[in-house]
Every structure is written in structure tokens, then in C-alpha cells.
Amino acid sequence: MQKATYYDSSAIYGGYPYQAANGFAYNASQQPYAPSAALGTDGVEYHRPACSLQSPASAGGHPKTHELSEACLRTLSGPPSQPPGLGEPPLPPPPPQAAPPAPQPPQPPPQPPAPTPAAPPPPSSVSPPQSANSNPTPASTAKSPLLNSPTVGKQIFPWMKESRQNTKQKTSGSSSGESCAGDKSPPGQASSKRARTAYTSAQLVELEKEFHFNRYLCRPRRVEMANLLNLTERQIKIWFQNRRMKYKKDQKGKGMLTSSGGQSPSRSPVPPGAGGYLNSMHSLVNSVPYEPQSPPPFSKPPQGAYGLPPASYPAPLPSCAPPPPPQKRYTAAGSGAGGTPDYDPHAHGLQGNGSYGTPHLQGSPVFVGGSYVEPMSNSGPLFGLTHLPHTTSAAMDYGGTGPLGSGHHHGPGPGEPHPTYTDLTAHHPSQGRIQEAPKLTHL
């Protein structure tokens, strides 16, 4: 590098006013490769200015630049011992001689061995070349960018170091930040305000899908999703936090809506006054439907008696006529007494307001297809039929829709002789009362 700098310094030194009298004027009139043809002692003297021309030519990339540069370096080592001779007039005459024999570059190499011994003394003994060495450093920065790059790099290095520290701070905040360039783009504002992250639709779909399965993300899964979606772990963590808050807010809004608008239907069955036939049906275990299409043996009288359309079932009972005095609907023989205790459905199934109360819904008779079906949840202990299962399918049939064609209907428990009910069809006046009763009790 010292030789190169010395060589470049001579090249730049050729343009200074010190050599303007001979070197600069001489360089203007000469071709780049002409000086190598001169072989005499005069040629040694004017080789130095010729090298000054060749230094820019070497930058141009000519094919023989390496050989020429070596020749120039070796010839340059000799001439500095004769700096005063540079200003003598014998230098201008050689140009006409040097112009014709330009195509002889390989001849200079044999000549250099003679001046080479003189190479070591010149730098120490000659002041002008030293000044040339000292001067060209600022000019070399302008002409040779390869040499000035380290110095320029040193000047910029503090700023570069600072920016690297900034990027380190940012990357420490978010471990992998390639895709988040939007967050880090303002270096000065990164600490004060974080830019809003814009997620793509594909990223949002994946995040929503993951949130559907897991509201809280474990770290391995978060790292996996960060690599999958080109996001940082911090971004995914913050997105899940925001999404959980949004979900909580939505649930609160839904809870408010259901509490305000949805409690009226949930409270409707609670008060006993609003319990109609439909509510009593819902309270049953199997919710027996009303089937008028399956006619019992004496279907016509009950159809005339129960001629109300199905639309009138949900209506509350107070709209009906007041109940008649207690009627003997059926008599059950006591276990030990011969007396026939009366069973009053009005006193049992109705409260003061004429509708079924909630405690008696399970025990109230239900009309199915022209027959009474008595659920056995509460009526079993009343009639002494404690051995029957408490289901609607095992309910007692008072209307005669079963396989028994005769008027007498025995209780379904064959092992118990007590609950033998008298024929309802044999007593015609009581049958008329039975036909009227369902209007008042079973609506």
C-alpha cells in the first residue's frame, strides 16, 4: 500500500503547480502509453511524468496496466534523486521522439535494475516527494474512493453504531421483527408510540381459528404461530389479550340482553296464576300431546264435552265459568272401610284463582284422546296405588280407551284389590257431570 500511495501521490502531484511548467503541459500533449518507448537517460527523467498519466489510465482498466504500473513504480524510485532536474528545459524535447515508438511497452523492464539501488535514499533525502506524500492524502480521498472508504467509514461509524443499538433495542422488544417493519420504521418514535399493526386477512383467520379452540395460548403454540404467520410472539400475545377483552365485552352485552328481554319467558311459569293447560303439559315428564284423532269407545259424548279448540288451551282458567259444586267423579273403595270417600278434583287440582297451582301440576289429570290419564307421581299415594311406576305410560285410564271394552275399569295393579272403581258409564247422571267437568278443570 505504501508503494501504491506513493504512486498515486506522484500521479496527483503531476497536477500541482510545482510541475505545471513541464509535467502538466507535457502530459496534455502525450498519449498514455507513449513514454515507455524512450530508453535513454533522458527517458528515465521523463518517465516520471509519463507514469503520472498512466495512473489514471490504470484506473480505466487497460489490458497492460499491471506491467506499466510496475515499470512506473521502479522508474519513480530513481527520479526523486534528481528533483531539480525536473524543472530543466531538456524534458520538453523528448515528446516528439516519444510519440512515434508508442507500441513498445515491454522494453522498460530491463532498464529498472539500474535505478533500483537508488530507491531507498530518495524518500529520506528529497523533500519534494515527501511533500507529495503528505499532500496527496486529501486529494486522494477525492480521486480514489477505494482508499478513502475506511476513513469515511470511521467518520460514519458512531452514527452506524447508534443505529445498531436502536435496532437492538427494538429487536429485544420483539424477537423476530422482519415482518413488523411497520412498527420499527420510525427510529425516534419507536419508544414513545408503537405503530398500529395491520394484520392480513389470512393471519386474522388463523388467529380467530386458534382463539375458537383456545382462548389462552401456551408459549410453544405461540412460537409456532409466530413462525407460521410471520408475526412476533409479542404481537400474537397482544392480539389474544385484545380478543379476550372483546369476547368478555360481547358476553357481557349478551348477558344484559338476556337478563332484560329473556327473563320474562323464564319467569312466566313461576306464578301460579299464569299456569294454563299448556304450562301444566310442559311440567309433565313426557309432555303428553292432545290427540283427538284416536276416538275412545264413547268418543262422541266426550268430544261434545271437550269441544274446545286446541288454541284455547293456553288460556288461563279464570276466563272459564265458575266451577260447579263438588261432584262425585269416581268412588274408590277404602282398604278397610266400606264407605266410598269422595274425590273432588276441584278441591285437589284447583287453587283459589281457578288455575292449576304449581305444586299440583304433576298430579292433575290429563286428557288424552278422550280419556283421562292420571300421572302417578302424586296420585299414587292418594289412591293407595303406591306400587305403580311414576310415569305417564303407567297412568290409570278412567275413560275406557284401553282394551277393556266393558264399562268396568280395574286398576292396573292386579295384586291390589282395593282400588276398584265403579263404572262411570253406568251412572247416567254422573256421566253427564263428567262430561261437563273437563271444561272447567282441564282447560
Swiss-Prot record:
Residues 132-151, 166-178, 188-197, 257-267 have a biased composition (Polar residues). It is found in: Nucleus. Residues 192-251 bind DNA. Residues 74-151, 163-197, 248-354, 401-443 are annotated as: Disordered. GO terms for biological process: angiogenesis; animal organ formation; animal organ morphogenesis; anterior/posterior pattern specification; blood vessel remodeling; cartilage development; cell population proliferation; embryonic skeletal system development. Its main location: nucleus. A motif (Antp-type hexapeptide) lies at residues 156-161. InterPro entries: DUF4074, HD, HD_metazoa, Homeobox_Antennapedia_CS, Homeobox_CS, Homeodomain-like_sf. Residues 80-126, 311-327 have a biased composition (Pro residues). Residues 301-310 have a biased composition (Low complexity). SUPFAM superfamilies: Homeodomain-like. GO terms for molecular function: DNA binding; DNA-binding transcription factor activity; DNA-binding transcription factor activity, RNA polymerase II-specific; HMG box domain binding. GO terms for cellular component: nucleoplasm. It comes from the Eukaryota. Keywords: Developmental protein, DNA-binding, Homeobox, Nucleus, Transcription, Transcription regulation. Gene3D superfamilies: Homeodomain-like. It holds the Pfam family Homeodomain. Belongs to the Antp homeobox family. Sequence-specific transcription factor which is part of a developmental regulatory system that provides cells with specific positional identities on the anterior-posterior axis. Binds 5' to its own homeobox. This is Homeobox protein Hox-A3. It comes from Mus musculus. The lineage of its organism: Eukaryota, Metazoa, Chordata, Craniata, Vertebrata.
